[in-house]
Amino acid sequence: MNLADFDYHLPPERIAAEPARPRHAARLLHVRGDGLDDRTILDLPALLAPGDLLVVNDTRVIPAQLTGRRGDARIGITLDRPLADGTWRVLLRNARRARPGETIAIDGAGGIAAEVIDRAPDGSATLRFDCDAETFRAMLDRAASLALPPYIPRPAGISEQDRQDYQTMFAAEEGAVAAPTAGLHFTETVLAALAARGVGLATVTLHVGAGTFLPVREDQLERHKLHAERGLIGPETAALVNATRARGGRIVAVGTTSLRVLETAAGDDGTLAPWHGETELFITPGYRFKLVDRLMTNFHLPKSTLLMLVAAFAGVERMRAAYAHAIARGYRFYSYGDASLLERA
């Protein structure tokens, strides 16, 4: 398939600039094999069965947006992920003024600077910050801000409300640049109803990287390569997933991040083992899902890798119909928008 197969027109007023309040007041489009149902997040427990298992991503978003100076040039820096040698993979804006071997002075960082180790044509680069890990983390709290997606305008800057809104209630393991947004809809009220229904809960970790903000530039999908993201599945989660499947329960991934880490670690027979490492799994129509039975996810950008993933999961034509329905019915899109619950095609 080509990139143009995943394009659609979204009226600008359908892009959510703020989350629903309370979080569980968001709408939920149930995409079934034989139709579409308009629901809310509070209906989620009734749409699942006793013995099903929800798998959520417990990554925590870090302040990852820095600015720096090279001479009179202002350079934007979005952290992506740390590398084993202590350097950081980043995305740069105005990167032409930052060549390998040169140094960027970080704004508001008390004298901390970063050496450019290498730079790629897509704006990604490797930086070495001249401080230890503890000092670096403290510097982020002083000098960095949340890297909100560009479609969430904040002309006055990031607020304390944003810092609260852009974390899920499951956030525990620091490392994400962007939030796993399907998890933003959960509250204690929803969790209590799920527990009363007999639905289990398990956690995985996938640290969403800065590559999530990059567009797909290849018209032929097979030529596109995802940026690597770090993840972990512990032994307790692996055991819960395997036990759920053995007794006939369904695995419900909360978010594309949870789905990608589960599918990365699953064996060909769907058995899950503890895992940690990096994944570059790029799911497009034709992919054979090994483990996940249902997917809860927000509504994604045109021509995005996440839209390709949901089309692979629920079917291309079914998702076209679902998105047309959601636009016509006034659903709110993207990170702070409404959600969908997809049954696997």
UniProtKB/Swiss-Prot annotation:
Keywords for this protein: Cytoplasm, Queuosine biosynthesis, S-adenosyl-L-methionine, Transferase
InterPro entries with a match to the protein in the record: QueA, QueA_dom1, QueA_dom2, QueA_sf
Top-level class of the enzyme under EC nomenclature: transferase
One MF term in the entry's GO annotations: S-adenosylmethionine:tRNA ribosyltransferase-isomerase activity
Function, in words: Transfers and isomerizes the ribose moiety from AdoMet to the 7-aminomethyl group of 7-deazaguanine (preQ1-tRNA) to give epoxyqueuosine (oQ-tRNA).
Similarity comment: Belongs to the QueA family.
Protein name per its UniProtKB record: S-adenosylmethionine:tRNA ribosyltransferase-isomerase
